[in-house]
Amino acid sequence: MWAAGALKVRDCLAATSVTLRRCLKLGATMAKSKFEYVRDFEADDTCLPHCWVVVRLDGRNFHRFAEKHSFIKPNDSRALHLMTKCAQTVMNELEDIVIAYGQSDEYSFVFKRKSNWFKRRASKFMTHVVSQFASSYVFYWRDYFEDQPLLYPPGFDGRVIVYPSNQTLKDYLSWRQADCHINNLYNTVFWALVQQSGLTPLQAQERLQGTLAADKNEILFSEFNINYNNEPLMYRKGTVLIWQKVEEITTKEVKLPAEMEGKKMAVTRTRTMVVPLHCNIIGDAFWKEHPEILDEDS
């Protein structure tokens, strides 16, 4: 009887094995169907190896978005902090990003030089960053604009740039920070003329046409008693996001001797977190202070 039972089990297993092989063969045949040739039309967008991959996103038609949502001019700290929160979320989700820089309605994300994330496909870098950022913007909106409902979903476009050396990467980030300074100085003077002097936007634009940075600083100081150098660093320098070790102090119950049972103690632990900085990244000082960003092992 035992032998007969074993024979039945063996026959059952053999039949199952045959069925499984047929299913696998059928699956392979279906996967390699006659329609598979359409994959040949996909463009190869692999980023060059051993280069810094940068994804820069910009708000789409954000002038209109800012007007519709009553952004404060020339700078709305709520909007800037929201942008930074979204960028931090992106970095926490995509840990191959070593540094990010943001100003106004744009953010640039720099991936590790040796990152092999999604086989270095540019489309993957761009779509993951932009989609994560856009969804975070909507998700965290109410945390920063409590009294202003989101009237319609914001849009962001993105691009991928590849830089072959540390110097070209530093020059790129310097360019973006220089752009922040130029735009913010202009906007600070422009809105002072509109809001405090009563000029129309067109009149303010004509007043500033052809002026240099020194001229704009003079207008601010002589007419509005504003020293541009005293404006918040976040407005003048933008925001740099880097990974840093941070000590966190939390209070929790710890198992202690009986006489101290039920006591709570402060526990300090070190975590690596995304930290915002408002500093100058043009020149060598920043990079000497944070050499790990350009480490060859990145």
Curated annotation (Swiss-Prot):
Cofactor: binding details: Binds 2 magnesium ions per subunit.
Catalytic activity: a 5'-end ribonucleotide-tRNA(His) + GTP + ATP + H2O = a 5'-end phospho-guanosine-ribonucleotide-tRNA(His) + AMP + 2 diphosphate + H(+)
Keyword flag Lipid biosynthesis: no
Chain sites annotated for binding GTP: D58, G59, R60, N61, F62, H63, S104, D105
Cofactor: Mg(2+)
Binding site for Mg(2+) 1: D58, G59, D105
One cellular component (GO) term of this entry: mitochondrion
Database matches in InterPro entries: Thg1_C_dom, tRNAHis_GuaTrfase_cat, tRNAHis_GuaTrfase_Thg1, tRNAHis_GuaTrfase_Thg1_sf
GO biological process: response to oxidative stress; stress-induced mitochondrial fusion; tRNA modification; tRNA processing
Keyword tags: Cytoplasm, GTP-binding, Magnesium, Metal-binding, Mitochondrion, Nucleotide-binding, Nucleotidyltransferase, Transferase, tRNA processing
Pfam families given in the database record: Thg1, Thg1C
Major localization class: cytoplasm
Amino acids binding Mg(2+) 2: D58, D105
EC number: 2.7.7.79
Purpose of the protein: Adds a GMP to the 5'-end of tRNA(His) after transcription and RNase P cleavage. This step is essential for proper recognition of the tRNA and for the fidelity of protein synthesis. Also functions as a guanyl-nucleotide exchange factor/GEF for the MFN1 and MFN2 mitofusins thereby regulating mitochondrial fusion. By regulating both mitochondrial dynamics and bioenergetic function, it contributes to cell survival following oxidative stress.
Descriptive protein name: Probable tRNA(His) guanylyltransferase
Species this protein is from: Bos taurus
Gene expressing this chain: THG1L
